[in-house]
Amino acid sequence: MGLRNLLDKVEHHFEKGGRYEKWYPLYEAVDTFLYRPGSVTRTTAHVRDGIDLKRMMIIVWLCTFPAMFFGMYNVGHQANLIFAQSPDLLSAQDGWRFALIGALAGFDPNSLWDCLVQGAAYFLPVYLTTFIVGGFWEVLFASIRRHEVNEGFFVTSVLFALTLPPSVPLWQVALGISFGVVLGKEVFGGTGKNFLNPALVGRAFLFFAYPAQMSGDAVWTSVDGFAGATSLSLAAAGGVDNILGHGLTWMDAFLGHMQGSMGETSTLAIFIGGAVLLLTRIASWRIVAGVMLGMVAMSYLFNAIGSASNPMFAMPWYWHLVTGGFAFGMIFMATDPVSASMTDTGKWLFGALIGVMVMLIRVVNPAFPEGMMLAILFANLFAPLIDHFVVQANIKRRLARNG
C-alpha cells in the first residue's frame, strides 16, 4: 500500500465527526507537506500561479541550507583548531556530545568529516529542540483554532536555530522558541497576522533574559573553558586594525572562517541562498537594497565624522557587511513578507531604516557592538506606519492630479 493510499484511508478518522477530529491539523500538516494540497479556489476571483505558501516556505527553508551546512562545518572547525593549538583542552571536555564525536569522527581541523560531525553534534540538537517544541505550539494553536498547521514554522525554526551560539543550553532553546512562537506570532492570530518576526522575538528574549549565554567571549565556540571574541567585539575594542591583528582578513570574514552564531558567519553562504530568494522574487530586492544603502550611507557619515575614542566610527561599510549578523538579517529576516512593509516605496524606506538603525546601534553604542536584531524589530514596529503614510501620500497625489 502506497503512502498516498494510506493517508487517504485514514483521512475520515480525522475529519469532522471522526475519532481523531481534534488532531486534523496534524494530519493535514503531514499530508500537505508530503503532497500538493487538493483544495482549490471555489469563488471568484481565480488566480493561477506556480507557487503557493507551501512551496514558498520550503524554498526559503532550502535556501538556508548553504549557511546551515557551512555553519556546522565552521563550528567544528573552530573547535578543532582550538584543540590542535591547546591539546589539554581536549582532555578536559566531557559529555555525550564528545562521546558521540569520538565514536564517529576525530578532532582534526583539516578533516571535513571531523568538522561536520563536531558541528552537527551541536547544531542538530538545537534545531531538533526548536522544531519539536515550536511544532508543539503550532499544532496546539492550530487544533484550538481548527485550522491547518502552516509550513511557515519550517522557516521560523531553522532561522531561530541559526542565530544561536553553539554553546546555548537546550532548555533555553526551548524557552526562546516558545516565547517567539506564542508571544511573537500566535497571540496575534498566527501566520500572516504577526507584526514582528517570531524568530527574532525569541532570539531577543534570550538575549535580554540570559545575556551570559547569548553574549560575551565564552559562548561562540563549543569548547568548554575557552573564550574568544567575535569580529565585531574585536572591532569595538580596537577597530579594523584589531581584527587584522588577530589574523582575521576580510576574505576570512566573508567566507565565514571565524567565531559567531552558527548560521551567521559566512556571508558567501548566505548570499548563495539569498540569490535564489531574489531570483524567485520571494525576497524583496527593494528591502535588501534599502538595507544596504542605509548601512553604506551611515557608514560613510560616521567615517567622515570620526572619533578619537570610538574606533567603530572608522570601520568601513564592507567590514560591517561581513561581521556579525548583518548579512543573515538582511537576507532572511528583513525580507519576511509578513512583518515588513508591503508597498514598493515602503519597502525602500523599511530597508533604509534597518540599515540606518543597525549602524547607530553598532557605532554609537559601544556596549552593544551588534545591532541587526534590534534594528529589524524596530523597523517591524514602524512597517505599518510607513505603509500608511505611503498610501496616504499616493491618495493625495492622485486627488491633486485628478482634481
UniProtKB/Swiss-Prot annotation:
The EC number(s) this enzyme carries: 7.2.1.1
Gene Ontology terms describing biological process: respiratory electron transport chain; sodium ion transport; transmembrane transport
Subunit structure of this chain's protein: Composed of six subunits; NqrA, NqrB, NqrC, NqrD, NqrE and NqrF.
Catalytic activity annotation: a ubiquinone + n Na(+)(in) + NADH + H(+) = a ubiquinol + n Na(+)(out) + NAD(+)
Alphabetized GO MF terms: FMN binding; oxidoreductase activity, acting on NAD(P)H, quinone or similar compound as acceptor
Keywords: Cell inner membrane, Cell membrane, Flavoprotein, FMN, Ion transport, Membrane, NAD, Phosphoprotein, Sodium, Sodium transport, Translocase, Transmembrane, Transmembrane helix, Transport, Ubiquinone
Membrane topology summary: Multi-pass membrane protein
Main location: membrane
Cell membrane among keywords: yes
Any Pfam family: NQR2_RnfD_RnfE
Transmembrane portions of the chain: 56-76, 121-141, 164-184, 225-245, 260-280, 287-307, 312-332, 348-368, 371-391
Function: NQR complex catalyzes the reduction of ubiquinone-1 to ubiquinol by two successive reactions, coupled with the transport of Na(+) ions from the cytoplasm to the periplasm. NqrA to NqrE are probably involved in the second step, the conversion of ubisemiquinone to ubiquinol.
Top-level EC class as recorded in UniProt: translocase
Protein location: Cell inner membrane
Family stated for the protein in its record: Belongs to the NqrB/RnfD family.
Signal peptide: none
Residues modified to FMN phosphoryl threonine: T230
Cofactor(s) for this UniProt protein: FMN
GO cellular component, one term: plasma membrane
The protein's name: Na(+)-translocating NADH-quinone reductase subunit B
InterPro entries registered for this protein in UniProt: NqrB, NqrB/RnfD
